[in-house]
UniProtKB/Swiss-Prot annotation:
InterPro entries: Flavodoxin_dom, Flavoprotein-like_sf, HemG, Protoporphyrinogen_IX_DH. This is Protoporphyrinogen IX dehydrogenase [quinone]. GO terms for biological process: heme biosynthetic process; protoporphyrinogen IX biosynthetic process. The chain crosses the membrane at residues 208-228. Leishmania is not able to completely synthesize heme; it is thought that the amastigote form localized in macrophages utilizes coproporphyrinogen from the host to produce heme via the successive action of HemF, HemG and HemH. Coiled coil: none annotated.
Length: 231
């Protein structure tokens, strides 16, 4: 009797759907090239799946306004021991990674901070640029993201939809994930080269300031629109 194909659990946390698109792309490549059986699952439903039933696990999560989703953070906290005991990998998705000096685990502040604070030590980490969907955002998100993009030198045309993802990098990551050995050797905490705390706090503070200013801008614009309608 033929042996069953290896199974891979692929859990994603997405804000606007693009992280799932990336995960689906990786799953298709694995299925085509290695015949691995891939279960692509929203991490909100992750607890319905038993990690011990899989040979490998991949987690992918988007970042919005500097934060991963609560569902993603809670899942990792709950299952970090199981994740570290099996072949596991992780990728984050954020617009900051559109910049070449912000698209690795050591240079992307959000990813680096998460890994340094997490008890989980994935064997493989990727950072991918996300997508900008101005027409699909609600008013608040559109104004705030537009403001952040202006401050960071990005696209501010609210009619644009832009995918910044480097698909070649995604394919390389998929190949590296497929190559992870099934046996997990003891390993130290992943070396993400954390910068001094002051720098991290400064970076986080800057993003908080951007969020506050952006929210203020959104409120002001909303008030002006309401006032104009009443007038």
């Amino acid at each position: 009797m033929a042996s069953q194909s290896p199974k891979c659990l692929m859990l994603y946390s997405t804000t606007d759907g693009h992280t799932k698109t990336i995960m689906d792309t990786i799953a298709r490549q694995l299925a085509d090239e290695t015949k691995v059986r891939c279960d692509v699952v929203d991490i909100k439903d992750g607890n319905s799946y038993v990690l011990a039933d899989y040979e490998k696990v991949l987690l992918g999560a988007s970042i919005r306004y500097g934060h991963f989703s609560a569902a993603f953070i809670n899942y990792v906290k709950q299952h970090h021991s199981e994740l570290s005991a099996m072949p596991s990998a992780f990728f984050s998705v954020n617009l900051t990674a559109r910049k070449l000096d912000k698209n690795t685990a050591t240079t992307n502040v959000y990813t680096r901070k998460f890994l340094n604070q997490s008890s989980w030590s994935p064997q493989l980490v990727g950072v991918f640029a996300g997508a900008l969907w101005y027409p699909r955002y609600n008013f608040f998100d559109r104004v705030l993201i537009q403001f952040i993009m202006k401050v960071t030198g990005g696209e501010t045309d609210s009619t644009k939809e832009i995918v910044y993802t480097d698909w070649a990098a995604v394919r390389r990551f998929a190949s590296d994930f497929a190559a992870l050995p099934l046996a997990v050797p003891p390993r130290p905490k992943a070396n993400t080269v954390e910068k001094p705390d002051g720098i991290l706090r400064s970076g986080s503070g800057a993003h908080c300031l951007l969020a506050i200013v952006g929210m203020s801008a959104a409120v002001i614009v909303g008030i002006r629109i309401i006032a104009a309608k009443r007038g």
